[in-house]
């Protein structure tokens, strides 16, 4: 069946592929990614080469400009953002969305509600002390995931591993990657870690088609955040 073929092509992109990963992809937390594999492979055909992980200079200048602007906004507003999370100290993993696939959800910092050409989702996750995620896959490859540790952790036990590549936030607070690859975030320290997460449209030969597809996806997913982030407390 075409779905199985697409799934096999999709999962084979992993550098760390083994029987455990294949099982997780088809039968575990990658099942939705498997179901969406035909769409994700179509996105690959429309887009520039997928490097899996990226430096900001790997992206076109328009993408770089928006990323740098968002980073600046998070740096300017980090105290205001942290105050929002102070009311939920009992929750180990907490999340806040400013935009979700282009829909504005929180206007406490108006600049995050600007209409961006490439950025479609803007949010913040808080990992409290000794808190990590399980291994998981993002569902869609129409966008790349940008993570930015704006409270600048100082210790090495706070990091992300994406298909075998480890990024320690102490040394590089910005990480851009294809989140349909298996990944896992760790905070093994006794400190909080705030992480901005941003979804940006993949650089593409057919930008308008990508935007049109994402608009349709946004309509479908408008009220589904809790499905994708069921292990998180939303504020």
Residue ranges and their predicted role:
Residues 133-136, 159, 177, 183-189:
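Short beta-strand His + acidic residue motifs that chelate non-heme Fe in jelly-roll/DSBH
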Residues 163-176:
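Short acidic-glycine-tyrosine-enriched beta hairpin
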Residues 111-129, 142:
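A short glycine-rich, His/Asp/Glu-containing loop-to-beta-strand
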Residues 2-112:
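Non-heme Fe(II)/2-oxoglutarate
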Residues 88-92, 115, 230-235:
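Intrinsically disordered, low-complexity Ser/Thr/Pro/Gly-rich regulatory segments
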Residues 198, 202-235:
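Long, compositionally biased interface segments
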Residues 126-128, 139-155:
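Short, conserved beta-strand element in jelly-roll/cupin
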């Amino acid at each position: 069946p075409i779905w199985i073929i697409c799934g096999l092509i999709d999962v084979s992109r992993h550098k760390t592929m083994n029987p455990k990963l294949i099982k997780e992809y088809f039968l575990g937390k990658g099942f939705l990614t498997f179901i969406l594999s035909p769409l994700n492979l179509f996105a690959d055909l429309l887009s520039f080469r997928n490097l899996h992980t990226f430096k900001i200079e790997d992206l076109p200048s328009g993408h770089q400009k928006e990323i740098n602007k968002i980073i600046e906004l998070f740096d300017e507003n980090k105290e205001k953002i942290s105050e929002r999370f102070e009311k939920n100290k009992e929750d180990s993993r907490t999340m806040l969305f400013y935009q979700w696939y282009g829909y504005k959800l929180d206007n406490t910092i108006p600049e995050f509600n600007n209409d961006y050409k490439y950025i479609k989702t803007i949010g913040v996750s808080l990992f409290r002390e000794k808190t990590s995620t399980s291994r998981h896959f993002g569902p869609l490859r129409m966008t790349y995931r940008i993570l930015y540790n704006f409270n600048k952790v100082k210790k090495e036990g706070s990091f992300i591993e994406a298909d075998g590549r480890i990024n320690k936030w102490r040394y590089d607070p910005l990480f851009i990657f294809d989140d349909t690859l298996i990944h896992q975030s760790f905070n093994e320290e006794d400190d909080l870690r705030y992480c901005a997460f941003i979804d940006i449209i993949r650089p593409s030969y057919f930008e308008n088609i990508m935007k049109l597809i994402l608009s349709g996806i946004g309509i479908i997913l408008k009220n589904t955040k809790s499905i994708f982030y069921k292990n998180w407390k939303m504020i």
